[in-house]
Amino acid sequence: MIALAFALSAESSEFVSLLAQRSRDDRGVITGAVHGHSVRVFHTGVGQAAAQAVTADFLARHAPALLISSGFTGALDDSLAVGDVLFAANYSTRDLPASLAETVRQGTLASTAAMLDSPVERTQLAARTGAIAVDMETEFIAAECHQRGVALLSLRAISDTPSAPFPLPPAVLFNVARQQTNYPGLLLYLARHPGAIGRLARFTGQVATARRSLATALDRLLRALPHS
């Protein structure tokens, strides 16, 4: 069985639609099949605490041959564009299949405790770590996999870049502590900053682009992976 971890269903929905024989258990784990592989999809939530706890619980209940850490990631420079797909070589313990090498960027991914809100923060993180993209979960998912001897492959799609950043302050977009968007707060922010409405609409398009690219890349990856 191959497991796929996403932070949120907004990241996984297009891939999940590709699965045959879909079912969902009482913990929200989605079971299905694609290209002859049995797969289970679970959602960790956003950030270190959620990713560690949910991944540990999943691995205590299931024994995947491979876990794919997936979802969205932010580019640290504009060499990556929205919709590009990154293979995080520093966290992956399996090689990327050769058939994906021409369409998937390989590089270093950093994981942080908070969303980065400015191009300056992105530049500083890149200089400090050598990373080309950032997320909030993969490092912590990788630690749980390492502890249990589970092979890991990280494949993520770019949803934002220095020139196409988050449209609103991160705390307005998503409350990590509560694992949800505060919609009354979001509406209040937009009422006070109407110019942000257009930016939010553009970002919604960026997310859709990343979701499509990710589903395509995951479909190609699972087609290329050998069957155990």
Segments predicted by a language model, with ranges:
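Glycine-rich phosphate- or other oxyanion-binding loops that anchor nucleotides, phosphorylated ligands
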Residues: 2, 25-228
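Short, conserved "active-site rim" segments that organize catalytic pockets and cofactor/ligand binding
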Residues: 1-19, 85
